[in-house]
């Protein structure tokens, strides 16, 4: 039986309607100042439990008062434009109503965490990269959330133990990474070029499987 489902956040359960890319703007400002801005700088921004200004300070990016305000406004505009996909709201409700545990497992910077939690107040479990200091597909992030939920991944052939699924739009982070940790990862193809194209369909596949297993037991 499937006992838990992990969801990616951006591109899966939420979308950004007005992208301003404040962190990308910050990194560009650092390069403009002659700083060495590397992929590790971006990784730090996603794994540090720091506000936006704290990231700039840590990376040594000097911001004038006007530039700081400009980037802060860009961040707030992007945050305020985040909205849930309607199919995500329905799918999560259907899974939870059936007794399946639901969690969000996502790579994101600190300001985005409260927004996700606010949009889905009924989701109790979260694994956010900025809180854990690692990003997907590091196996620790998947193991952490499974531990929080009290589920044990890796039991696909043991009918006595619950199985854990994940779905998202990244092959590396939401399919391959989870599978390496014993979680059956699935890809969401919102462009309709794949077997799973929306989360309502995914939820019904999960519920149908559990129903079939109950009837066969």
Language model regions located:
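Active-site neighborhood of HAD-like aspartate-dependent phosphohydrolases
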Residues: 1-40
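Asp-based, Mg2+/Mn2+-dependent phosphohydrolase catalytic module
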Residues: 1-7, 15-17, 62-65, 89, ...
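Hydrophobic alpha-helical core bundles mediating ligand binding, dimerization, or RNAP-core interactions
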Residues: 20-31, 47-52, 71-79, 112-116
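Alpha-helical substrate-recognition element adjacent to the catalytic core
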Residues: 30-58
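Short, contiguous strand/loop micro-motifs
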Residues: 39-40, 77-79, 129, 161-162
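Residue-level marker of alpha-helix boundaries and capping positions
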Residues: 43, 82, 164-166
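Acidic-and-aromatic substrate-binding clefts and catalytic sites of carbohydrate-active enzymes
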Residues: 45-47, 80-83, 134-136, 194
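Metal-dependent phosphoesterase signature
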Residues: 49-90
């Amino acid at each position: 039986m499937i006992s838990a489902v992990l969801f990616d956040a951006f591109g899966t359960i939420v979308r950004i309607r007005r992208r301003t890319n404040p962190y990308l703007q910050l990194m560009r400002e650092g390069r403009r100042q002659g700083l060495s801005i590397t992929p590790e700088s971006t990784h730090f921004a996603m794994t540090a439990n720091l506000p936006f200004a704290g990231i700039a300070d840590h990376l040594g990016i000097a911001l004038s008062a006007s530039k700081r305000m400009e980037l802060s406004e860009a961040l707030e505009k992007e945050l305020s434009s985040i909205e849930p996909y309607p199919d995500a709201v329905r799918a999560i409700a259907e899974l939870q109503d059936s007794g399946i545990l639901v969690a969000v497992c996502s790579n994101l910077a600190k300001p985005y965490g409260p927004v996700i939690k606010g949009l889905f107040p009924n989701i109790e479990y979260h694994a956010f990269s900025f809180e854990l200091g690692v990003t997907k597909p590091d196996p620790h992030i998947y193991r952490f959330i499974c531990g929080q939920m009290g589920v044990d991944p890796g039991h696909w052939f043991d009918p006595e133990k619950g199985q854990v699924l994940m779905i998202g739009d990244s092959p590396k982070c939401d399919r391959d990474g989870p599978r390496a940790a014993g979680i059956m990862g699935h890809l969401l193809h919102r462009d309709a070029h794949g077997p799973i194209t929306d989360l309502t369909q995914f939820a019904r596949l999960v519920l149908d499987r559990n129903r079939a297993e109950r009837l066969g037991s």
